[in-house]
Swiss-Prot record:
Native species: Arabidopsis thaliana (Mouse-ear cress)
Identification of the protein by name: Protein root UVB sensitive 1, chloroplastic
Protein encoded by which gene: RUS1
Residues of the transit peptide: 1-68
Intrachain S-S bonds: none
Consequence when changing residue 349 to G: Loss of interaction with RUS2
Length: 608
């Protein structure tokens, strides 16, 4: 019997027989597809198993799969033979018709049985591997289900997995171009564009939390300032003779004289730059008041055209001084906003914000100026409204600023609270309590809601205000020391310090050595706070300077406490965000030099 015979017309005839009725040679050449499919549940389970491990089993050879199917068919066929024979000897009862093939059949059957067992165990291993891989893919799928964002500054882009290319792709690429032109997307793109041009890169993580509120208020005040500027410029032009047939050369000379005299104020005011570092909020508010006063004077020039140069020069001086103070204090604010030391970025975006507000203000100012015309009364009324808005927004913007440096008032408030409660206060708590000018008590304009908050102790606030008034940095040695014993006692006590502290006529006099640093001034202020605490809480009143320098004296006790606790106070303050690199102060220029001339100084007639 040839193979071609079995694979052609008679294959269906042979395949229709029972497996026990087919000879061993026919079994070898009978195609796997022509076998009668069993109906047992074991075969169904086998099919499901094959489907589950398809990726593993597909790598096996065709011969292995054919043998496996033959084994299952033989096994199930034998079972059918047993069922058909009833009480007979099973499938082998009828299969013994061909005695010449019995021995070869038994050997092949044994081989098929062993091969089937091998394939069975292979199936079990493949199934276990497939289950493990499926569980692993499930766990990976859970991880993929977690949202992944690509962040660039304030712009976020959601990434989704592409399982075909095995990579992450932007979610935006899944949408059509038409879907990106929706009003929501256009609004988002405009917002991203404004953020890119007007806010520092990495916002809000690249700046401090008070930056946005300050910028918003500053934008409104910038608009109001430009409106006032347009109205003032219009008044100046009317005063100089615009539209009244004035000689252009005379008008130009008056204008140049006005600006030239005004520039002198900026040069003279530059020597007081250290004042602006100590109280930048108060000086900035003063600069805004000065600027508005200058605008008001310029608007009065049409009423008094004969005093144009005088009034214009005074107004120009005020505007120049205000511009200098604004530029100086703006640097202090920008340095505080740059939480990642991105000073140039913050300054550049601040200038961009200023240009936007100025452009809007100029447009609104032109509209208001056209509505007012030449009426001075209407111009003054509009100026009053705009100035009120300008000053209110300025005040709100400065209240938003959280200064992290330590000037004498803030340092005294921090140290006093530390001595009372054992903890350094938060930055916001101290800035909310600090008045714009500590020496001017009414300058601390707090809202009624904030007046109800008593976060800091009243003792600490009273101590900070009192120390601010009584402190004198850079005192003269000749004004404090009156005899040789006091000088020797102070020099010996503060031998290893960069300053000399004593109390004289109710004032805390700090004499700075030539090598003293801002850190030494901060250290001296910590000792001043402890001296004040000893005076108010321990009842230790000041005695003579010589007695206070002895062991057990006020100066000796306070200096010993400073040497033990100053570093702890610094660390506690730094932990809440304070910059403790040094004291921001304006000391007097006098310094003390100690060295080879010390004996000569102490033995001089002036010291006795």
């Amino acid at each position: 019997m040839s193979c071609s015979y079995l694979l052609s017309g008679d294959a269906s005839v042979v395949a229709s027989r029972r497996w026990s009725d087919v000879s061993s040679r026919q079994r070898l050449f009978l195609p796997r597809q022509s076998l009668r499919q069993p109906s047992g549940s074991s075969f169904s389970r086998c099919v499901r198993l094959v489907a589950n491990v398809n990726d593993h089993f597909s790598k096996q050879s065709l011969a292995t799969r054919n043998c496996l199917a033959s084994v299952f068919s033989a096994d199930l066929g034998g079972s059918n033979g047993n069922n058909d024979n009833g009480n007979g000897g099973g499938g082998g009862g009828d299969g013994g018709g061909d005695n010449s093939d019995d021995s070869s059949f038994d050997l092949r059957y044994l081989c098929f049985l062993l091969l089937g067992l091998s394939c069975f165990f292979h199936f079990r291993l493949s199934a276990a591997s497939a289950i493990a891989k499926d569980q692993n893919s499930d766990s990976n799928g859970d991880a993929v289900k977690e949202t992944v964002w690509e962040v660039r500054g304030s712009k976020r882009k959601r990434l989704v997995p592409d399982f075909v290319k095995d990579e992450f792709v932007s979610e935006e690429s899944a949408f059509e171009l038409s879907s990106s032109l929706t009003p929501e997307n256009l609004l988002a793109q405009c917002r991203n564009l404004l953020t890119q041009f007007l806010l520092p890169e990495g916002f809000p993580n690249s700046v401090t939390s008070d930056y946005l509120d300050y910028s918003l208020w500053r934008g409104v005040q910038g608009i109001a300032s430009q409106i006032s500027g347009v109205l003032a410029t219009q008044s100046l032009l009317y005063a100089v003779g615009l539209g009244k047939g004035a000689i252009p050369t005379a008008a130009a000379i008056n204008w140049v004289l006005k600006d030239g005299i005004g520039y002198l104020s900026k040069i003279m005011l530059s020597k007081y730059g250290r004042h602006f570092d100590v109280h930048p909020k108060g000086w900035r508010l003063f600069a805004d008041l000065l600027e508005n006063a200058a605008f008001g004077m310029e608007m009065l020039t049409p009423v008094f055209p004969q005093f144009f140069v005088m009034i214009g020069a005074a107004a120009g001086a005020g505007r120049s001084a205000a511009a200098l103070i604004q530029a100086a204090t703006r640097s202090c604010f920008n340095a505080g906003f740059a939480s990642q030391r991105n000073f140039a970025e913050v300054i550049a975006k601040g200038e961009a914000q200023g240009m936007v507000s100025k452009s809007v203000g100029i447009l609104l100012g032109i509209v208001v100026a056209n509505c007012i015309g030449t009426s001075t009364s209407l111009a003054l009324a509009a100026f009053g409204v705009v100035t009120t808005i300008h000053m209110y927004t300025n005040l709100k913007s400065y209240q938003c600023i959280q200064l992290r440096t330590l000037n004498p008032y803030r340092a005294s408030l921090v140290f006093s609270e530390y001595l009372i409660s054992g903890q350094a206060p938060l930055i916001k708590e101290v800035n909310d309590e600090e008045p714009l000018f500590p020496t001017v008590r009414f300058s601390n304009m707090k809202s009624p809601e904030k007046l109800q908050d008593f976060v800091l102790s009243s003792e600490a606030k009273a101590a900070a205000a009192d120390i601010e008034e009584r402190l004198q940095l850079g005192s003269k040695l000749s004004d404090v020391i009156h005899n040789k014993e006091e000088a020797i006692a102070l020099f010996d006590l503060y031998r290893n310090e960069g300053y000399i502290l004593t109390e004289h006529k109710g004032r805390f006099c700090v004499m700075l050595k030539e090598s003293s640093t801002p850190q030494d001034m901060l250290r001296s202020l910590f000792q001043v706070n402890y001296l004040y605490w000893l005076e108010k809480n321990a009842g230790i009143e000041p005695a003579s300077t010589y007695s206070d320098c002895k062991p057990g004296g006020r100066l000796h006790i306070s200096l010993d406490y400073v040497r033990r606790e100053f570093e702890h106070a610094k660390e506690d303050s730094e932990s809440v965000g304070w910059v403790t690199e040094g004291l921001i102060a304006r000391p007097l220029p006098t310094r003390i030099r100690l060295g080879h001339d010390r004996e000569l100084l102490l033995s001089s007639p002036n010291s006795s």
